[in-house]
Amino acid sequence: MTNIRKTHPLLKIVNDSLVDLPVPSSVSSWWNFGSLLAACLAVQILTGLFLAMHYTSDTATAFNSVTHICRDVNYGWILRYLHANGASMFFICLYIHIGRGLYYGSYMYSETWNIGILLLFAVMATAFMGYVLPWGQMSFWGATVITNLLSAIPYIGTDLVQWIWGGFSVDKATLTRFFAFHFLLPFIIAALVMVHLLFLHETGSSNPTGIPSDPDMVPFHPYHTIKDILGILMMLTALSMLVLFSPDLLGDPDNYIPANPLNTPPHIKPEWYFLFAYAILRSIPNKLGGVLALVLSILILAIVPLLHTSKQRSMMFRPLSQCMFWLLVADLLTLTWIGGQPVEHPYIIIGQMASILYFTIILLLMPLVSMMENHLLKW
């Protein structure tokens, strides 16, 4: 008798995606981050759902409702900190996942890669809107500064900003709509994840060598199910340590001050995971130029497949390209550090140099080094 998981219309889809899926045997732990992201999304949706049951999206009561969750709701404090720090874990996994894609040439599967970029934008938008909801000082001023960037768009900019605000400043209407979108977007992200996986399973997974691995496959279950569960347990352990020992480590103390439109904080900055893009934005003195650089710093990922000049897919056997990759990682860490610093000497010039280097590495140095490696290998 045939196993039901192979014949049942619904179970068959699950079986082909999670049980009998052929996976290259050389796939390393860097391929774990997809499942970790799925786990992060599940944690965020669950904790967010319970938080939404107690939260009120009104400027008069939003801050107090978050305080109420932490003080009066059973285990509300752990829900709130799991959700806030879960976002940090989400972005750590997200950036490593993208880094893996760049290092091992996963971007050559262009459909999967492009849906991934769309997912990145959706997650960033969700995180930004979520940061506004506690209605602290940094929530209010972060929302004001970031939405105001759209006013740099010629002709329609000012109208667009007021349309997003629902008035002439960030106020009750803004908070209400941000809560609505923050609740809705994770479900859209979950749907996009399905499309992401659909495209991935059309081509099959890449592997560290970058060489076709059709003759050497292993089934997803039990090998990768065990591997993924171990990864998820390690991530949840790290998240639990963060939540239970230093829940405010990655947050901003200013967000414990209720939003006050009459008092601007000395240093307005986003959460740590946006600091690299914020540093690029600030490094250009012109408003429109800064906004364009900000958008391009993420959108540049879309043209990475076009800049692939190497005859090899992966960087595994390309030491010069590896140097360029790690230089890019160091540059992004520098930008993250600069984004959290005040706008003064020497931080301004360091930020400008790091921003120029970021675009130079991706657009110029990586393709040139790849061509040089081709020449050295006489290809």
From Swiss-Prot:
SUPFAM superfamilies: a domain/subunit of cytochrome bc1 complex (Ubiquinol-cytochrome c reductase), Transmembrane di-heme cytochromes. A ubiquinone binds at H201. Changing M194V: In strain: Isolate TK 15571 and Isolate TK 25127. GO terms for molecular function: metal ion binding; ubiquinol-cytochrome-c reductase activity. It is found in: Mitochondrion inner membrane. Changing M316T: In strain: Isolate TK 15571. Its main location: mitochondrion. GO terms for biological process: mitochondrial electron transport, ubiquinol to cytochrome c. It is a multi-pass membrane protein. PANTHER family: CYTOCHROME B. Heme 1 (or BL or b562) is low-potential and absorbs at about 562 nm, and heme 2 (or BH or b566) is high-potential and absorbs at about 566 nm. This is Cytochrome b. The lineage of its organism: Eukaryota, Metazoa, Chordata, Craniata, Vertebrata. The gene is MT-CYB.
